[in-house]
Amino acid sequence: MPKRRDILAIVLIVLPWTLLITVWHQSTLAPLLAVHKDEGSDPRRETPPGADPREYCMSDRDIVEVVRTEYVYTRPPPWSDTLPTIHVVTPTYSRPVQKAELTRMANTLLHVPNLHWLVVEDAPRRTPLTARLLRDTGLNYTHLHVETPRNYKLRGDARDPRIPRGTMQRNLALRWLRETFPRNSSQPGVVYFADDDNPYSLELFQKVTRRVSVWPVAFVGGLRYEAPRVNGAGKVVGWKTVFDPHRPFAIDMAGFAVNLRLILQRSQAYFKLRGVKGGYQESSLLRELVTLNDLEPKAANCTKILVWHTRTEKPVLVNEGKKGFTDPSVEI
C-alpha cells in the first residue's frame, strides 16, 4: 500500500507534465480548429455591420458560378433603344472548317450590342449543324438558305469566277430586309456584309453610318492592306489598290457598311449576278446606292486596320481514307 507521501510525490511530478502537454496541444491545434469552425459555420453571422450579407456567403464554387453567369449568360449585351441595329450578313457553305469559323465569328459578335446576325447558307435547306450552332450562341439571328444553281459552277467545288461565292446569299439577305421592314421605316440600322472566315475588331462595330461608311481591309489584292484614299478635308477621293484602281468602288466586301434606310429606299440595289467582271461585285451594289462623294471614311480616316481578310488553311484529311477512319457522326 503506497504511502500518502509517495502519492503526493507522484501527483506533483505528473501534474506539471499534464499541464504542459495540455497547453502545447491547444497552441498547436487552435488555428486548425478555428479554420474548420469557420468553414462549417454560417458566415452571415460575422457579416460586418451595413454590408450586404450576400457578399459574405459565397464559396469558391459560388463565385465561379456567378462569374460564369455574369460573363456568359448575359451575352449578348442588353438591347439598347438608343443604338441602331447592326444587321451582319454572313454567307456560309458546308466544309470541314465551317463550324470552327462560325464559332470564332460568333464569339466576336457576342460582344456587340444590338446585333442581328443574318446567316444565309448556300444549300437546298438549312443544315442541322448551322441551326444548332446559331441556337446555342444566344445571339439574335435569322437563318436563311438558297443554293447557288449548278450552272453557275464548274467541275467539282470550283465555281465560275464571274459568279463570286456568296452573291445569291447576300442578295437573299437584302430581299429579307426589304420584306421585313417597310420602305419608309424609321428603324435605325446598319447593314454589314461579313464573311465567316475573317477576324473583326470590336471597334469596327462602333462605327455608325449615315449613308455608306468605308475603311481599310488587310491582306487583300496582294497587298498588306487596301484602303480608300482620303484627302485633307476628310473626303474619299480614290483607292489605294493595285488591282484595277479605276473601279467605281475599288473596295473589298468587308470594307464598307450601309445605312439600313438606304437599302430599303433603293429597292433596285442588288449584287449583280451576270455581266460583272471579277472584283466588281461591290461596285455593282454601291453604285446603285451612293456616289464617291457620299462615302464616310471611318477607322481614323482610313488609317487603322479593323478587319483582316484571312483564309483558314484547308485541313489535310488523307488518313481518313475512303471509308473514313473517325466516326462521321461526330460533328466537327
Curated annotation (Swiss-Prot):
Spans annotated as Essential for transport from endoplasmic reticulum to Golgi apparatus and interaction with SAR1A: 3-5
Needed cofactors: Mn(2+)
Superkingdom of this protein's organism: Eukaryota
Membrane topology, Cytoplasmic segments: 1-6
Single GO biological process annotation from the record: carbohydrate metabolic process
Subcellular location(s) of the protein: Golgi apparatus membrane; Secreted
Broad class of where this protein is predominantly found: Golgi
Entry's transmembrane regions: 7-27
Molecular function as annotated in GO: galactosylgalactosylxylosylprotein 3-beta-glucuronosyltransferase activity; metal ion binding
Keyword annotations of the record: Glycoprotein, Golgi apparatus, Manganese, Membrane, Metal-binding, Phosphoprotein, Secreted, Signal-anchor, Transferase, Transmembrane, Transmembrane helix
Subunit structure as annotated in this protein's UniProt entry: Homodimer. Interacts with SAR1A.
UniProt protein name: Galactosylgalactosylxylosylprotein 3-beta-glucuronosyltransferase 1
Gene name of this polypeptide: B3GAT1
